[in-house]
């Protein structure tokens, strides 16, 4: 084996030389080998070349044409090259799948081929010779501008030998595939999509104009990084002269997709000397309480919440204490007369108003892949004398960096839990009958939540409240109130990860039903940060359960729970950004005929970001944009706003209603909700899902009514419908005792087609009456 091709390659590498396996020599190999061993289509580009002490030989191993090359074991030795006496036998197995090589320069091997065929196939050059060639090349042509002018002025084409022609094509092929060259070309506004075309034109120009000396010097260096770095300055001169229109076009695109230095987007905030107070600590450490105290003391203030539910809770609490406070969320606007304080969701933050104190809750959400941009915008753009940040330590370092960039003063206040969270070593041993009063059992799927609820109520005397993300905020608040009330029989909570933030709950112990969840693609372990957030909900100062406990249902999950709680918070290195509409509008002007869905994708490819930021995911936006492409008459701004509507993109019914809303709006018609409503609570899982879906559609209508007020006039009717459905959902959860249905059964059990709202007037009167009673 060692005397065959693999042996020669191995000896060449062991002597620390570079190896070039050229396409031309593969042609020779084909011609000298029988057709039974080598297919006639063998002459295809198959090689790469790397200088230095590494070898890279690439073959398309999965291609039937290369079946003659087998994989084997080789024994390293050297009989022709001085290897400094290191001729010890080393047996090594060589793979064939990877296009890469490791730090030791592992070689893909060939076997069962006569060694004599390699005489003119393997060109071995020592590093010293390669270095001399590189030095000679750079010394002789040190000025790329001068070389380019010589090439441009040349009229006589040099006669190249066939081997030189092939070698030049190899070199330019390597240049075209160089990631370094493609990235550097962006600096002169040659985009990656146009880069191959530019290289092709440059290759033709160079081969036609270059002199024989330049060719020979380049061939000596070969398709290496040295050749790429030598050719690149000449390539730049060629592109600047040859493609001015393309460069100008791409520069305009890049300039409008520039998301670098986002702090400069808010000049009024930069003109202020802001004080940033970071309340850093775990759940149930009092950090948000202290920030809210400062919020209520201020002459005017803003509280920014990650959830509607939490914004509503602060709104109620502050008003109950006699401080007038308004509520702003995507779905509702409640302006309280004489109010100087506002509780809002973070997406509703206004960077135009001036505040004495602003509170940004759950600041670690800046790193959220979808919504992080809202926190980043608020932190950079709020015009407030004091901004209080509440969150865990994961984003502390990047907040320090952002404050250094903006010139804001940063004050850090660190907190610990009032009482440590205790892990119970004794789990529930897989038996839900072991739950106790005050327990919160956390499951990560809707099906599991209801299975747990029904099992507990069947085998124990406990009654369960239920909280999960698809429920309306009003229903979740009702379930939380039911659980916190000691005067009823509902003493166990079954919840999803939605329990991690947004509700004040009197939880004695958090029990994890499982520590795995479906991420939309596969089952994965729950992230440590999420485990800590949820487990930290146990125990609450001032409640009947001040001490927090946590454990798992199954013993096999306990070690992972302990590991997650002991693990420090991961340090965040980047936070989210997303362009404003004005930036999208400028970008669209550069590509006027592009569909909006493609526009967003194009923007994502060309936008420039600082190292501290990432572009937030916009899969949801793109899917809605694709659906709305068929709707004519929408302006760019209309499409932008419709795409951010809170729609469940996995729910065809919700998507259909969004399409219908957009179609009516595009025709300048009043947008109505053509939806009936059940008169009683759900009797099955299918009916419960139907109620959830209906409420989501109504919520979407209310959100759109705040974007397009004139065209969504039936707000009062929709609010009444939404309130009614939220109450029906609460009743349904209290009575839920049905068997969970499969997806097939759910399809069969779909509700009848909507035939319009059945009783709007009476329902509106009822809702008004209830509001009046509450005011009294």
Swiss-Prot record:
Pfam families: DExH18_N, DEXQc_Suv3, Helicase_C, SUV3_C, Suv3_C_1. Keywords: ATP-binding, Helicase, Hydrolase, Mitochondrion, Mitochondrion nucleoid, Nucleotide-binding, Nucleus, RNA-binding, Transit peptide. CDD domains: DEXQc_Suv3 (cd17913), SF2_C_suv3 (cd18805). Its EC number is 3.6.4.13. Residues 268-426 form the Helicase ATP-binding domain. GO terms for molecular function: ATP binding; ATP hydrolysis activity; RNA binding; RNA helicase activity. Residues 85-101 have a biased composition (Acidic residues). Its cofactor is Mg(2+); Mn(2+). It catalyses: ATP + H2O = ADP + phosphate + H(+). One of its GO terms (cellular component) is nucleus. Residues 427-595 form the Helicase C-terminal domain. ATP binds at residues 281-288. It is an enzyme of class 3 (hydrolase). It comes from the Eukaryota. A motif (DEIH box) lies at residues 361-364. Its main location: nucleus. Major helicase player in mitochondrial RNA metabolism. Component of the mitochondrial degradosome (mtEXO) complex, that degrades 3' overhang double-stranded RNA with a 3'-to-5' directionality in an ATP-dependent manner. ATPase and ATP-dependent multisubstrate helicase, able to unwind double-stranded (ds) DNA and RNA, and RNA/DNA heteroduplexes in the 5'-to-3' direction. Plays a role in the RNA surveillance system in mitochondria; regulates the stability of mature mRNAs, the removal of aberrantly formed mRNAs and the rapid degradation of non coding processing intermediates. Belongs to the DExH box helicase family. Homodimer; in free form. Component of the mitochondrial degradosome (mtEXO) complex which is a heteropentamer containing 2 copies of SUPV3L1 and 3 copies of PNPT1. PANTHER family: ATP-DEPENDENT RNA AND DNA HELICASE, DEXH-BOX ATP-DEPENDENT RNA HELICASE DEXH18, MITOCHONDRIAL. This is DExH-box ATP-dependent RNA helicase DExH18, mitochondrial. The lineage of its organism: Eukaryota, Viridiplantae, Streptophyta, Embryophyta, Tracheophyta.
């Amino acid at each position: 084996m060692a005397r065959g091709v693999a042996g020669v390659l191995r000896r060449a590498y062991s002597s620390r030389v570079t190896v070039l396996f050229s396409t031309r020599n593969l042609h020779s190999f084909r011609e000298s080998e029988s057709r039974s061993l080598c297919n006639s289509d063998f002459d295809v580009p198959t090689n790469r070349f790397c200088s230095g002490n590494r070898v890279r030989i690439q073959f398309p191993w999965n291609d039937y044409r290369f079946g003659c090359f087998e994989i084997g074991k080789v024994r390293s030795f050297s009989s022709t090259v001085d290897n400094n006496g290191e001729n010890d036998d080393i047996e090594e197995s060589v793979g064939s799948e990877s296009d890469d090589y490791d730090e030791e320069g592992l070689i893909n091997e060939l076997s069962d081929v006569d060694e004599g065929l390699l005489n003119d196939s393997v060109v071995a050059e020592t590093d010293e010779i390669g270095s001399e060639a590189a030095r000679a090349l750079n010394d002789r042509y040190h000025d790329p501008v001068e070389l380019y002018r010589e090439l441009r002025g040349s009229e006589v084409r040099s006669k190249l030998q066939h081997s030189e022609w092939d070698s030049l094509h190899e070199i330019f092929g390597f240049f075209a595939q160089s990631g370094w060259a493609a990235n550097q070309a962006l600096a002169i506004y040659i985009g990656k999509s146009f880069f191959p075309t530019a290289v092709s034109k440059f290759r033709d120009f160079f081969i036609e104009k270059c002199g024989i000396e330049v060719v020979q010097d380049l061939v000596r260096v070969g398709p290496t990084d040295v050749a790429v770095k030598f050719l690149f300055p000449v390539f730049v001169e060629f592109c600047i002269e040859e493609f001015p229109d393309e460069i100008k076009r791409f520069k305009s695109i890049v300039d409008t997709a520039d998301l670098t230095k986002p702090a400069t987007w808010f000049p009024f905030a930069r003109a202020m000397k802001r004080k940033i107070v970071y309340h850093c600590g775990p759940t149930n450490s009092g950090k948000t309480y202290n920030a809210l105290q400062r919020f209520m003391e201020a002459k005017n203030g803003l509280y920014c919440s990650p959830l509607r539910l939490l914004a509503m809770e602060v709104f109620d609490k502050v008003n109950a204490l006699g401080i007038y406070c308004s509520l702003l969320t995507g779905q509702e606007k409640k302006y309280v007369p004489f109010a100087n304080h506002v509780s809002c969701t973070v997406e509703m933050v206004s960077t135009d108003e001036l505040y004495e104190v602003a509170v940004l809750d759950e600041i670690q959400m800046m790193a959220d892949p979808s919504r992080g941009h809202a926190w980043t915008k608020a932190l950079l753009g709020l015009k407030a004398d004091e901004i209080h940040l509440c969150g865990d330590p994961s984003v502390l370092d990047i907040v320090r960096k952002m404050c250094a960039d903006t010139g804001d003063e940063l004050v850090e206040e660190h907190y610990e839990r009032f009482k440590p969270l205790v892990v119970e070593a004794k789990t529930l041993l897989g038996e839900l009958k072991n739950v106790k009063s005050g327990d919160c059992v956390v499951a990560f799927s809707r099906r599991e939540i209801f299975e747990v609820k029904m099992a507990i109520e069947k085998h124990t005397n406990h009654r369960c409240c239920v909280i999960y993300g698809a429920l309306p905020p009003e229903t979740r608040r009702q379930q939380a109130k039911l659980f916190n009330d000691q005067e009823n029989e509902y003493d166990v909570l079954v919840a999803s990860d939605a329990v991690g933030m947004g509700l004040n709950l009197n939880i004695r112990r958090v029990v994890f039903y499982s520590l795995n969840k479906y991420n939309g693609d596969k089952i994965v372990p729950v992230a440590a940060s999420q485990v800590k957030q949820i487990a930290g909900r146990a125990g609450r100062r001032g409640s009947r359960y001040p001490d927090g406990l946590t454990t798992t249902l199954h013993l096999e999950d306990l070690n992972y729970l302990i590991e997650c709680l002991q693990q420090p918070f991961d340090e965040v290195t980047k936070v989210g950004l997303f362009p404003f509409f004005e930036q999208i509008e400028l970008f669209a002007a550069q590509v006027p005929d592009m569909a909006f869905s493609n526009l967003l994708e194009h923007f994502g490819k060309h936008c420039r970001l600082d190292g501290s930021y990432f572009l937030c995911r916009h899969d949801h936006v793109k899917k809605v944009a694709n659906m709305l492409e068929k709707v004519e008459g929408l302006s760019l701004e209309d499409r932008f706003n419709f795409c951010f509507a809170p729609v469940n993109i996995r729910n065809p019914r919700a998507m259909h209603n969004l399409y219908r809303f957009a179609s009516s709006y595009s025709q300048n018609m009043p947008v109505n909700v053509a939806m009936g409503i059940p008169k009683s609570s759900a009797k099955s899982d299918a009916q419960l899902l139907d109620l959830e879906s209906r409420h989501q559609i109504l919520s979407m209508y209310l959100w759109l009514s705040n974007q397009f007020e004139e065209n969504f006039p039936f707000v009062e009717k929709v609010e009444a419908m939404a309130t009614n459905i939220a109450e029906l959902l609460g009743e349904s959860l209290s009575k839920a005792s049905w068997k969970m249905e499969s997806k097939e059964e759910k399809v069969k059990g779909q509700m009848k087609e909507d035939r319009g709202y059945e009783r709007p007037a009476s329902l509106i009167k009822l809702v008004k009456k209830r509001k009046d009673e509450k005011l009294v």
